[in-house]
Amino acid sequence: MSENNGKQFINGQRVAANAPTIESINATDYQPTGYLFSQATLDEVDQAAQAAYQAFLKYQHTTQQQRADFLDEIAIQIENLGSKLQEVAAQETGLPLVRLQGETGRVTGQLRLFAELLRRGDFYGARIDTALPERKPLPRVDLRQYKIGVGPVAVFGASNFPLAFSTAGGDTVAALAAGCSVVFKAHSGHMATAELVAQAIEKAILNSGIPSGTFNMIFGSRVGANLVEHPLIQAAGFTGSLEGGMALFNLAQNRPQPIPFFAEMSSVNPVIVMPEALNARGEKVAQDTVASFNMGCGQFCTKPGLIIGIKSPAFDQFVTALIDTTRTAVPQIMLNQGTLKSYQQGIDALLNEQGFKCIASGQAPELISQAQPHLFQADQSVLLSGNPKLQHEVFGPMSIVIAVDDEATLLNGLEKLAGQLTATIIADESDLPQAKELLNLLTRKAGRVLFNGFPTGVEVSDAMVHGGPFPATSDSRGTSVGTGAIERFLRPVCYQNTSQVLLPDVLKDGNPLHITRLVNGVLTQN
Amino acid sequence: MSENNGKQFINGQRVAANAPTIESINATDYQPTGYLFSQATLDEVDQAAQAAYQAFLKYQHTTQQQRADFLDEIAIQIENLGSKLQEVAAQETGLPLVRLQGETGRVTGQLRLFAELLRRGDFYGARIDTALPERKPLPRVDLRQYKIGVGPVAVFGASNFPLAFSTAGGDTVAALAAGCSVVFKAHSGHMATAELVAQAIEKAILNSGIPSGTFNMIFGSRVGANLVEHPLIQAAGFTGSLEGGMALFNLAQNRPQPIPFFAEMSSVNPVIVMPEALNARGEKVAQDTVASFNMGCGQFCTKPGLIIGIKSPAFDQFVTALIDTTRTAVPQIMLNQGTLKSYQQGIDALLNEQGFKCIASGQAPELISQAQPHLFQADQSVLLSGNPKLQHEVFGPMSIVIAVDDEATLLNGLEKLAGQLTATIIADESDLPQAKELLNLLTRKAGRVLFNGFPTGVEVSDAMVHGGPFPATSDSRGTSVGTGAIERFLRPVCYQNTSQVLLPDVLKDGNPLHITRLVNGVLTQN
């Protein structure tokens, strides 16, 4: 790290009024890693927001090509960090190096996908209604609409994806692609990782000739709230707990000027196993299910926390296989001490709750930082009564299996679930005739419905939705993964009877950007 | 009116536990029109929301063609109401028959435009990323996204457009097009008008075979709050005052499950007159400006309430022409007694505020229900200090003119303005080189920027934006006029590895609906 280690990133400078006293902690042994950070002052939060606003005034006028090149350059600079990035991230989060290598690829892939999106140009949503001077009873004026960035965006790093949902993660990329500047609040769980990535972004800013305050980063506790309340911040993206998300959401809505606050929060991601699939391959499904809820130590927003099927001998065998596989599951290091404590509290709460019982546990932890996998079984009454304990996300390597009497009970029970990021149906061809009503129900409940896979893989692509009805997110109309994520930070503006000289290229006659536009009700590249 | 006059419209039935005691009032003489309405009970609000929810479960699965036909049928049924509709609306609102005839055309045109939008199919935002089983290091699954309705929507009628922003107005049509059911809260200022239009919608529901609870309407005070707090309501559209809008917005955000609440509220719609335009045609601009702020008795959300130019002899002449024209302006009937009272309070507040003076008044009212037009002049200090009185919308036939020292002062002053629905630049060709920075500034402030026209004409088309930064609306990402209005009530859902048998037609291989879709990053109709 440089001599500036631990200072805020503001307007291309490193700034810190406070001494560096916040310690980066090793996730494995809870000892300091040696990296220290300064708590941002209120004045520094203000400086960061001001810098973002001043940069926005220029950055919003960059061309789509300039922004695409900038995102590509960030990807290169992140690659240039080399293995140091994964090593530091592994220290701070306890995640395995191979996972962090994959996550780095996801970050750079995501940056390049958004660059493609920018070059494609349909994110502008360009619409042109040309003048109809002869129309009766009234002539029509010339109207041209496109989408522009809402302004400076506050982004909150998630603990569980120190790269892909953090400093240069999905929300940051979506905001930068939209033409918005960013103030990023570094997560306390991986500040040194954030520092490295921020340095890469700063280099990309310099290399690309982008305004220096386009990206800013602050460290510290409570500064997130200050940031959300800052009048120059115009939107925010968050990934984290329901409690944390709603606290910030409420601040955002209760400002003198409310702002869009997209929080991705809580989901138990039900998996429904259909009878014929269980008959055909129950044991394999059980193994894959256990692998999915243990993947990344169960620290995925899309971890399948609820497994439901209809009572049958095949389902009993499936549960037996879940138990057997869970018992072989190895303990893994959790992201930090707080996360492990929350996990253990969540497990204890279920152990003490009527209708739930722990039916299998994985191997015992060998390190103080490891979590033991657990499998619970719950009565169907817990589902049918809408018991909030069932719907409370326990972040970590556990899941709950429920057998229901019949299909009607299954549908009744699922109807009681709150909004979800994902819902999964494990089905064979012969199950499909029974799956239609189930699919309709789950479509109302979730942002993504998947068949014969597990929700823990979240592809970054145009068609992905990582969102869903509350409490999965604070606004079901958004996604935080995939190119659709840009929509959260765009607003439409309409120019009426505006001279060609003054119009942006995207709306000019002759379509100089060669993008698809809706012209007089017809999608065209002309 | 039928014998059921005054009861709630719930699930295709007329229901009222309370006696009809709320009077419809004639806007001209403040006497009862004779139509009486029943205050909805809390139980009736619940019945309406339940009916909307049950209908949504079916209505959401109607095809785009079925919904398009339904909207067309509503237009026909509204036309079938004949001149009775405008006569009743004229009684209740004091608006001239010819205006209400035009507004009826706007309503039916809007319904048919949304039917076109549905048939075009791009509102689905269909995106397909096909599986890449050979991709390294990980295969890609098949992902298909489209947009679906968020659920039952609460819609609030606006006082100033008893047809176009009311029962079958922009918000209702956008929600119905999105596949959402509606509970409409009738505005107390035109309940008999609302009753007629609701009857037309009910006929269209019957004729089109649409589920009976797809549209519901309730009467009464405070029921709007009950509606927004009802757990089955999933979004809301509102047009009205800042106070009313924010009260409901706060309820919507503080529910256990917050919901999107799109409120179109407050805007002073600045008009900037450029030097060369004034030199060339100052007197004509003055006449048109006065006509615009008096149109519809100044009761448009887009009324130009602020006129700004740079000091010059031509600007002085322009102000003189504004004064002369204002003095000839005739008084018109306001929508209701409350609106007139608010207008007079707004005028009184300006008369008592330092920095403002009334420089012209129109002809004196002859009826108790008429408003007198007024023109104010304000010091530039009022603009530069961001005086909230200047930014407070005074709903009615008035405007404020300000002369500023120079272009820099103009830009500084405009920077102090809050968000606007519209901003207007009156410019000649030779003004355009100076207009670029102004345009950039106004683009940040407004949802629509227009040249050489007046904002009071709001075309209903694909490219229109009737929205803008707070407090113009509660969310700058939406529009309540034009086909873009549908976006507010749609959310994306993604199907992963889903069988062709179960996929909706919009996402099937072979594109059976022949719509434009984004397939593997390419917009195509294949």
UniProtKB/Swiss-Prot annotation, chains A, B:
Catalyzed reaction equations: 2,5-dioxopentanoate + NADP(+) + H2O = 2-oxoglutarate + NADPH + 2 H(+)
Origin superkingdom: Bacteria
Active site: 264 (proton acceptor), 301 (nucleophile)
CDD domains: ALDH_KGSADH
Keyword line: NADP, Oxidoreductase
Catalytic activity, EC: 1.2.1.26
InterPro entries (UniProt xref): Ald_DH/histidinol_DH, Ald_DH_C, Ald_DH_N, Aldehyde_DH_dom, Aldehyde_DH_Superfamily, ALDH_KGSADH
Involved pathway(s): Carbohydrate acid metabolism; D-glucarate degradation
Gene Ontology molecular-function annotations: 2,5-dioxovalerate dehydrogenase (NADP+) activity
Keyword NADP: yes
Enzyme class: oxidoreductase
GO biological process: D-glucarate catabolic process
Residues that bind NADP(+): 159-160, 185-188, 240-241, 393
PANTHER family linked: ALDEHYDE DEHYDROGENASE-RELATED (PTHR43353:SF3), SUCCINATE-SEMIALDEHYDE DEHYDROGENASE, MITOCHONDRIAL (PTHR43353)
Family note: Belongs to the aldehyde dehydrogenase family.
Reported function: Catalyzes the NAD(P)(+)-dependent oxidation of alpha-ketoglutaric semialdehyde (alphaKGSA) to alpha-ketoglutarate in the D-glutarate degradation pathway.
Protein name: Alpha-ketoglutaric semialdehyde dehydrogenase
Species for this entry: Acinetobacter baylyi (strain ATCC 33305 / BD413 / ADP1)
